[in-house]
């Protein structure tokens, strides 16, 4: 693995892996991930992907082993707090939050238990895979507690008599409900994030990082945007433009055979709901099309 190539650590398996790979492919990177390979070379860019455990990524960045990493903010902050407590290097630079991997680290208790606030957790034994984040929250609240550290199946700890409550990642809450638990307190909100090691980069690597960031911005913005086309009566054009969400001035073009209407094209950065489309139609708009955008660059 050449030091001249940009080294990016990503999760080998798990909730962030697939979406991370898809993002890089949308950015124009060609690669083939197969079998148990730990290093994958991009076919069209001087980039190497390191496929590792998610909890190894922060340390690889903080120790300067790789240049960039994609990691959930929950895992990143847990490792940062742990290394800081041990006096180990914990510096990194956040380049941007990404548009996937959303979750929250929450304390959950028995579904029948009354909860009035964090003070109700005093003296409880809490099972978690994230002891540093849990400790940070509880210390901030000034609440004494004890920790039961588990590496998986945290939600079964109360039923097994290992703990009174848990602190675990929550997306929908279905797993908690299936185990007779309810969410009581959100400790930390997380999304996937792109991070960079500390230190200088040579001109080629710096330019490649900037290129990736620009393409990521374009991919994420395109995913959140829609291209809207419609025919609008000329006498209702201003009212129709006022209805269109999150839009800059649209492109307005004459129609070849209908002088009473114009074609309106625009990029919307907000969702166009059915109600808005019905209002547009009520104003006389027709041929309303809402299309996804694959890529965009401003």
From Swiss-Prot:
Catalytic reaction(s) noted: 1-(5-phospho-beta-D-ribosyl)-ATP + diphosphate = 5-phospho-alpha-D-ribose 1-diphosphate + ATP
Pathway it works in: Amino-acid biosynthesis; L-histidine biosynthesis; L-histidine from 5-phospho-alpha-D-ribose 1-diphosphate: step 1/9
Main function: Catalyzes the condensation of ATP and 5-phosphoribose 1-diphosphate to form N'-(5'-phosphoribosyl)-ATP (PR-ATP). Has a crucial role in the pathway because the rate of histidine biosynthesis seems to be controlled primarily by regulation of HisG enzymatic activity.
Keyword terms of this UniProt record: Amino-acid biosynthesis, ATP-binding, Cytoplasm, Glycosyltransferase, Histidine biosynthesis, Magnesium, Metal-binding, Nucleotide-binding, Transferase
InterPro entries found in the cross-reference section: ATP-PRT_HisG_long, ATP_PRibTrfase_cat, ATP_PRibTrfase_CS, ATP_PRibTrfase_HisG, HisG_C, N-reg_PII-like_a/b, N-reg_PII/ATP_PRibTrfase_C
Locations listed in the record: Cytoplasm
Control of this protein's activity: Feedback inhibited by histidine.
GO BP term (any one): L-histidine biosynthetic process
Domain of life: Bacteria
One Pfam family in the UniProt entry: HisG_C
The name this protein goes by in its record: ATP phosphoribosyltransferase
Keyword Lyase attached: no
EC number: 2.4.2.17
Cofactor(s) annotated in UniProt: Mg(2+)
Protein family (similarity comment): Belongs to the ATP phosphoribosyltransferase family. Long subfamily.
A GO molecular-function descriptor: ATP binding
Cellular component annotations (GO), alphabetically ordered: cytoplasm
